[in-house]
Amino acid sequence: MKTIIRYLRQEIKMSQQDLAESVGVTRQTINALENGRYNPSLLLAYKITKILNEATYGEDKDSFLSIEEIFKFSDDEL
């Protein structure tokens, strides 16, 4: 699975630790997600998407990215 978590997180100058604390996981989990070594639960993917969207776009919900835009599965992973 590919993600754009690292890109979005760095754009808003958020550390892995800050994101991890915001969604209730360890920094190691965020690192594994960013490096494609961990597939999140739907709930975790939703929490990360929500935090990153709000931090990046504020109240401009029209600009929000979907879970599918942040977490990209290849066909062989489905």
Residue ranges of each PLM-predicted region?
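Hydrophobic micro-packing sites on short alpha-helices
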Residues: 45-52, 70
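Alpha-helical residues within the helix-turn-helix
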Residues: 10, 21, 50
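Short, charged recognition helix plus adjacent turn
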Residues: 56-78
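Short, conserved catalytic or interaction motifs in soluble domains
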Residues: 35
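A short, Lys/Arg-rich alpha-helix, primarily the initiator
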Residues: 1-11
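Short alpha-helical DNA-recognition segment
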Residues: 13-32, 63
